[in-house]
Amino acid sequence: MSASSVIHYHANIHKALKYAVRLDLIPSNPADKVERPKKDHFVGSFFDADEVNRLFEVSKGTKLELPILFGAFYGLRRSEVIGLKWDAIDFENDTIIIKHTVTSVNLDSKHIIVAADTTKTKSSMRTLPLVQFVKNRLLAIKAEQDNNRRLCGRSYNKEYLGYVCINEIGDLIKPHYVTEQFPKLLEANGFRHIRFHDLRHSCASLMLANGVPMKQIQEWLGHSDFSTTANIYAHLDYSSKLSSADAMLTGLGIGDAR
């Protein structure tokens, strides 16, 4: 079990025992005496621009096309991708609003779908620009879905009407499907292994590599505070290190770093 998981479980246990103390059920909180491990410093894997573009190509026309597109280009979380609805996409003003999520809970070995008009944090609810190449693909997919609905008639699953990530008969592309099938797609096409969530990290790393300020990346990804973004991606911000080196060299009258 990772240190992060231990910290998470400890926090929940501590909270429950704290409530028990308040109700005078126990004299003190034994969790106070437990030493928590230090949180792991996670360094994710990233795809570069060539790998992302090739991934777009091999996933086109598959059930993973849209999850990959939104995960890599917009840096959406899996829950945000699956929760995307057509009414959140404004084709006239070219905007996408991230406001609905879909997750799955494993209960008695069954995946239970949980949909909610909420996001991970308040900052996660955000509006992003609908760029032309994504717009063109979405319009084509929307037309395909409309045609599938007409062809299937009563056999079409209307439970998920309005969702973007659905298959030919209207079934939702489930969160666990994305997690299970993504590594299979990578292996089948000769990619190195990364997790689906690493597409979000790939998005951030490409932005940093192209000079996008950390603050803008925070807003793009929907992080609740700047420190979250900085803690995860500061080690990738090599351009800022070059700027710092230039400042030192200029101050010393030596030259520049590049």
Which sequence ranges carry the predicted segments?
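Proline-centered turn/helix-capping motifs that create local helix->coil transitions or kinks
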Residues: A20-P30, F91, H100-L107, A140-R154, ...
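Basic, Lys/Arg- and aromatic-enriched nucleic-acid-binding interface segment
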Residues: I7, R22, I26-S28, D32-W86, ...
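A short, basic/aromatic helix-end/turn motif that makes direct DNA contacts
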Residues: G83-I89, Q218-S224, A234
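DNA/chromatin major-groove-contacting recognition/catalytic segments
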Residues: N53-R54, V58-K60, L107-A115, N210, ...
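Short, basic (Lys/Arg/His-rich) helix/loop patches that form interaction surfaces
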Residues: A3, E57, G61-T62, Y74, ...
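Catalytic-site neighborhood detector that most strongly recognizes the C-terminal catalytic loop/helix
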Residues: F46, V102-S104, K135, L221-A247
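N-terminal core-binding DNA-recognition domain of tyrosine site-specific recombinases/integrases
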Residues: M1-L25, H41, L172-Y177, R192-D198
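C-terminal secondary-structure termini that scaffold catalytic or DNA-interacting sites
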Residues: N93, S104-N106, H111-M125, Q132-V134, ...
